[in-house]
């Protein structure tokens, strides 16, 4: 799935793991205001067994171990949270990510089947979400415990819980950020990303700088091969005409003109590598010295929650509920177990 590969790969690379453990006695917190004890949300409970506490159990193919492991959803979400976001980030940002991670896996189970035999889902970033059980600490456990069973609901349905590292200023609709060719989901919207200008600590500060602005150079043959996988025959040379044929409402490139041929920008990003071509918010594009050189802002497809935006909002005092409902419109947070 295009959006899954893009989303998980860029997060795993953009947000290196680290941080300090936080000792805490963990207990599930009350559901947010508006969340019911057992909400009427359509989710694939018939596919899953539950443990003695009523928490669904997953068969997860762990790529690193090359085997299927049985874990409950909450334990799985801990590993995802540690893989998708730094484990020393503000607690409310981690809680927001946990709600999205839980929603993501249930939406995956509702719509898809893992390519790994005997598994419900995997830790393969091309299939689902990043996962790093070794980076789980007390802060991660607290974020998951305090959001236990909570998911996003869009009119009683599980939404696509999209997220990205940095919006570059504005979030995107799915049709421009992901090349979404279906009806635009009613819960996506373009809003200011709310990312901070600076971050505390040298590691976070460096990560933020890399997410704010990027530049990449691709040899012509690499670009031509990538375009070929997309069914577009492109030949590049120094001085070739390169244009942004169409931009979406958030300013992202939707279609690129490469020496007379048109290619979908989000597709090209995946084909070239989403950790190199970090976004489609392209600010410059040129062909010189045997390479396609481009620069841009932001990191990721731009749809849904900005992780750096969640960081900034949490630092400013926003709750997890306020964060996720800022990025997704007309949604509620509901408790499934």
Predicted ranges, named:
Residues 1-337:
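Conserved, single-site charged/polar hotspot
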